[in-house]
Amino acid sequence: MIEHIFIFNNSTSLSNPVFDISEVAVGQHLYWQIGDYQLHGQVLITSWIVLGGVIIFTLLANSDLKPLPVGLQNFTELVTEFIRDLAKTQIGEEEYLKWVPFLGTIFIFVFVSNWAGALLPWRLIELPNGELAAPTNDINTTVSLALLTSVSYFYAGIRKKGLGYFKRYIQPVVFLLPLNVLEDFSKPLSLSFRLFGNILADELIVGVLVALVPLFVPIPLMLLGVFTSAIQALVFATLAGAYIGESIEDHH
């Protein structure tokens, strides 16, 4: 993995033998040693911050529920309605309600994680090694979310169809079995690398531009990063719902 990206300051002259170099670190981690295992400490720290923020916001918004929602309660109900519509569209009217909590958790965690990476000045917090960033900036987080999605759509299909779920691998013809199996293995890969790649690329571009021109030039890209972060959360949740809906639909 790339460890360092060196950027020559634009104010240097080729005639000057001493070059000012800015550095953007990639792939460095703060490790916590637990027995024989190493954990990525900065990912756990930012994940706990995101989860804590979501839990506190939810408790504040819904601690005093009213028949006519106002303020934060109104906002949380709008988010819930949006997630219900997404689940209904992707999974279908018969099964969607039981999957609203799962898709809602996925969407909100990815959305808040992405925005935390785009909006919060994580780099102001110094660590012994590595630096804080969005949880979704780490491949371990995105792979975990993708594998959780894979387990969910296998569970949904087997729960509804039993072992008959695996008939889908030989439909419409038997010789498509390898391709159908490969498709199921490629789904978590595409989910995880799409999210990881977009978030990492956005943070790298902003980091490089801030190192080169630290004032106003990076602002438009930072705003674009906020927009794409929201889109990536929507894409991840939509595809998760689509995979679950595909696993429980009847094949004729």
Curated annotation (Swiss-Prot):
Membrane-crossing segments per the record: 41-61, 100-120, 138-158, 204-224, 225-245
Q: Which of UniProt's keywords are assigned here? A: ATP synthesis, CF(0), Chloroplast, Hydrogen ion transport, Ion transport, Membrane, Plastid, Thylakoid, Transmembrane, Transmembrane helix, Transport
Kindly list the places in or outside the cell where this protein is found, as annotated in its UniProt entry: Plastid, Chloroplast thylakoid membrane
The molecular function GO annotations come to: proton-transporting ATP synthase activity, rotational mechanism
GO cellular-component term (any): plasma membrane
Its record classes its membrane topology as: Multi-pass membrane protein
Matching entries from InterPro entries are given as: ATP_syn_F0_a_bact/chloroplast, ATP_synth_F0_asu, ATP_synth_F0_asu_AS, F0_ATP_A_sf
Please state the span of the N-terminal signal peptide per the UniProt entry.
none
Family per UniProt?
Belongs to the ATPase A chain family.
Q: Which HAMAP family match?
A: ATP_synth_a_bact
Tell me the subunit arrangement. F-type ATPases have 2 components, CF(1) - the catalytic core - and CF(0) - the membrane proton channel. CF(1) has five subunits: alpha(3), beta(3), gamma(1), delta(1), epsilon(1). CF(0) has four main subunits: a, b, b' and c.
- What is the annotated role of this protein in its UniProt record? Key component of the proton channel; it plays a direct role in the translocation of protons across the membrane.
Q: List the NCBIfam families hit by this protein, alphabetically.
A: ATP_synt_6_or_A
Name of the protein in question: ATP synthase subunit a, chloroplastic
Give the species: Oedogonium cardiacum (Filamentous green alga)
For this protein's source organism, the top of the classification is: Eukaryota, Viridiplantae, Chlorophyta, core chlorophytes, Chlorophyceae
